[in-house]
Amino acid sequence: MDFKDYYKILDVEPAADDKAIKTAYRKLARKYHPDVSKEAGAEDKFKEASEAYEVLSSPEKRAEYDELRKYGRQGRPFQTPPGWQSRAGAGAGGFEETADFSEFFSSIFGGRPQQGGRTRNPGRKGQDVEMELAVFLEETLSGESKQVSFKVPQHSPNGQRMGDITKTLNVKIPAGVVDGERIRLKGQGAPGIGGGANGDLYLIIRLAPHPMFEVEGHDLVITVPLAPWEAALGTKVAVPTLTSRLNLTIRPDSQNGQRLRIKGNGLMNKSGERGDLYAQLKIVMPKQTDEAARALWQKLADSAAFDPRAQWKG
C-alpha cells in the first residue's frame, strides 16, 4: 500500500492549526462533494479529503500520524513499524464508520472488521431536510415537474457541522396533492455520517392562493358578479375554470349568495376523480347612476310589491 500525506491532500503545512485544517477541508469538501461536482474522480477526492480531515482534526490521531510520517512519502510503498498499535483507534475522533477509508488509514488506526469479527457499525443517518413548496391549483391536476433548490447541511467525518450546500432537483408533484401534504424523497437529505444512510427530503405542499378560486376540500368556489337586472331577468355567463371557460345559465329571480354547482371542475383527488366547482352569485350595484337610471329605479320601487325586511315585522 502507498503512503498518504494528509497535509498535502488538504494543501496545508504540517504546522497548520485546527482552523486552517478545517478551512482547507471545507473548501475541498464543497468542491468535490458528489452532490455538487460533476468532475471525474470527484467522489474519490471527497473521500480522500474526508479521511485526511478525520486524522488531522483529531489531536490523538494527528500526533500518531506525525510520528509515522517520517517513515513514508506520498505515493510511495509504506508499512507500519513492527509492533505498531494505535492508541487513538479508528473511532477516537467521533467517526463511527471507516469502511470507506483507505487501507493506509486502517493499517494505522484499525477500524475495519476483522475476518469473522464483529458486525460493523452502520454509522449515523444524515439529517432530514424539510421545505415548503408552493404549488398552483392548475399544477395539481396533471402532476407537474418543478425545480426545487434547498440547503443541505454538511458534516465532517467526525460529525462536526461544516456549513451548507445548495442542492437543486427536478421533482414530479403527484396529481391530487392537497395543502399541508408531505412528500418524502428518500436519500435527498443530508449525507450520512460514518457510512450511514442519507437523510430524506420532505416537501410540504402549500397551495398558492388563486386570484379567482377558493378551495374547500377538493371543491372550488368562484364568485360570479351579477348586475341586478341579470339576477332578475336571467342571463348566461362565461365562467372561468382551472382549464377553460364554461357557459353558465343564470335563471331569472336568482338570489345573492346562491350557489350553482358545476360538476367535475374542482380539484383532483388521489383516485383521479375531480371535485366540483361552485359558482356563488353576488349581485353588484353600479357605482354611479345618472338621472335616467335613477328614474327607472324609482319606477321599479313604486311598482314592485316587495319588502326585503318583511320578516322583521311581527
UniProtKB/Swiss-Prot annotation:
<feature type="region of interest" description="Disordered">
    <location>
        <begin position="73"/>
        <end position="92"/>
    </location>
</feature>
<dbReference type="Pfam" id="PF00226">
    <property type="entry name" value="DnaJ"/>
</dbReference>
<dbReference type="InterPro" id="IPR002939">
    <property type="entry name" value="DnaJ_C"/>
</dbReference>
<dbReference type="InterPro" id="IPR008971">
    <property type="entry name" value="HSP40/DnaJ_pept-bd"/>
</dbReference>
<keyword id="KW-0143">Chaperone</keyword>
<feature type="domain" description="J">
    <location>
        <begin position="5"/>
        <end position="69"/>
    </location>
</feature>
<dbReference type="Pfam" id="PF01556">
    <property type="entry name" value="DnaJ_C"/>
</dbReference>
<protein>
    <recommendedName>
        <fullName>Curved DNA-binding protein</fullName>
    </recommendedName>
</protein>
<dbReference type="InterPro" id="IPR036869">
    <property type="entry name" value="J_dom_sf"/>
</dbReference>
<dbReference type="InterPro" id="IPR023859">
    <property type="entry name" value="DNA-bd_curved-DNA"/>
</dbReference>
<keyword id="KW-0238">DNA-binding</keyword>
<dbReference type="GO" id="GO:0009295">
    <property type="term" value="C:nucleoid"/>
</dbReference>
<comment type="function">
    <text>DNA-binding protein that preferentially recognizes a curved DNA sequence. It is probably a functional analog of DnaJ; displays overlapping activities with DnaJ, but functions under different conditions, probably acting as a molecular chaperone in an adaptive response to environmental stresses other than heat shock. Lacks autonomous chaperone activity; binds native substrates and targets them for recognition by DnaK. Its activity is inhibited by the binding of CbpM.</text>
</comment>
<dbReference type="GO" id="GO:0003681">
    <property type="term" value="F:bent DNA binding"/>
</dbReference>
<dbReference type="GO" id="GO:0051082">
    <property type="term" value="F:unfolded protein binding"/>
</dbReference>
<dbReference type="GO" id="GO:0005737">
    <property type="term" value="C:cytoplasm"/>
</dbReference>
<dbReference type="InterPro" id="IPR001623">
    <property type="entry name" value="DnaJ_domain"/>
</dbReference>
<dbReference type="GO" id="GO:0051085">
    <property type="term" value="P:chaperone cofactor-dependent protein refolding"/>
</dbReference>
<keyword id="KW-0963">Cytoplasm</keyword>
<dbReference type="GO" id="GO:0042026">
    <property type="term" value="P:protein refolding"/>
</dbReference>
